């Protein structure tokens, strides 16, 4: 019997963001179920790692603490202290999930030089905006596969902001991506640009979270609901007044409790119905048991669909959500005003599931081709 191929995944697995950790979990899980031996490599971009280290920190190294900046600095520290208990709980929940579900107990952080020593049969770069220099404080060679010459590397659903590459950065991409055996990205727009730069075929694929079905996430959920009564769930990836108003109106009309999930507690956010310390498991459990969901998040939308919920995505501009809704013929779930809601409207998830299944199949075929050929 042939030994399983060893796959090393490089992504933003250590970011304390529901989408970031769940996409990493999904890609690793899918590859293992496809018969490979997948492992998330514990390489952490220094800048991103610093953002999520434990403890309150102020960017002294930026020289942001000139006397003219003291007011802003103390305001930021004050807001952090205000939500310190919740932030610590959230930090602990994310670190537990990352350690147990993503890294399988790995503790050593890998350097660029360490990556070659992992001796993987294939290295997969992605998903997420791993090619965004503004996120990694300059291009990070690890996410472009610039290590272990001669080892096979492919990308999966890699991305950049707005799906476009500034002209000044195109020469770097042209050179850096030449070493990849196969390339896939998140956006069609980006695919065309990368094809032109590299001369390679570039495939668009689903977000890794969509590679799995609802049942594949069951092991992450709490058995019992976190809220006993019926509730509307509102998830804010960024604060938005309209999103809050839509969720409040729906809860009032339907007579349900409103539960809001926010990333950070501030003095402006005060309600017993607001949650600030949820980890990935809590996030998914809140979605599973909600009667209806309101969100301005791509992954909030994704999991609303996977868990076959009534939902509304509330935003002004978000190409990523809009593209997903258009592909699944769910454009009516995007609203920009309170009076656009129809509480009786259901969703034909049979049709949605069929389209999703086909798209998922194409992405799995890309992975098989990328690994085996």
Q: What residue ranges belong to the model's regions?
A:
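Active-site anion-handling motifs in enzyme catalytic cores
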Residues: 1-373
């Amino acid at each position: 019997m042939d030994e399983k191929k060893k796959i090393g995944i490089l992504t933003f697995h250590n970011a304390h963001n529901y989408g970031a950790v769940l996409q990493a979990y999904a890609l690793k899980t899918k590859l293992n179920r496809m018969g490979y031996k997948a492992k998330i490599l514990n390489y952490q971009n220094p800048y991103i790692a610093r953002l999520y280290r434990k403890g309150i920190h102020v960017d002294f190294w930026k020289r942001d603490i000139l006397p003219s900046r003291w007011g802003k600095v103390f305001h930021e520290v004050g807001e952090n202290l205000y939500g310190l208990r919740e932030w610590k709980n959230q930090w602990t929940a994310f670190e537990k999930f990352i350690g147990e579900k993503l890294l399988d107990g790995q503790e050593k952080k890998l350097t660029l030089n360490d990556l070659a020593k992992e001796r993987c049969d294939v290295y997969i770069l992605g998903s997420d905006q791993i090619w965004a220099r503004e996120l990694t404080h300059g291009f990070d060679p690890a996410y472009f596969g610039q290590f272990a010459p001669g080892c096979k590397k492919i990308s999966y659903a890699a991305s950049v902001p707005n799906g476009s590459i500034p002209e000044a950065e195109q020469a770097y991409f042209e050179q850096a991506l030449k070493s990849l055996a196969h390339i896939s990205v998140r956006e069609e727009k980006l695919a065309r640009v990368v094809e032109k730069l590299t001369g390679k075929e570039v495939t668009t694929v689903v977000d890794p979270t969509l590679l799995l079905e609802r049942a594949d996430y069951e092991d992450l959920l709490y058995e019992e609901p976190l809220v006993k009564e019926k509730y509307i769930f509102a998830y804010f990836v960024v604060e938005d007044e309209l999103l809050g108003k839509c969720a409040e109106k729906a809860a009032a009309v339907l007579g349900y409790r409103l539960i809001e999930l926010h990333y950070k507690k501030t003095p402006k956010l005060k309600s017993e119905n607001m949650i600030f310390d949820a980890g990935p498991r809590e996030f998914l459990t809140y979605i599973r048991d909600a009667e209806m969901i309101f969100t301005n998040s791509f992954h909030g939308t994704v999991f609303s669909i996977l868990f076959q919920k009534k939902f509304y995505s509330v935003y002004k501009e978000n190409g990523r959500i809009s593209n997903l809704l258009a592909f699944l013929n769910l454009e009516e779930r995007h609203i920009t005003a309170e009076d656009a809601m129809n509480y009786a409207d259901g969703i034909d998830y049979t049709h949605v599931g069929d389209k999703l299944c086909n798209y998922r199949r194409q992405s799995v075929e890309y992975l098989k081709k990328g690994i085996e050929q």
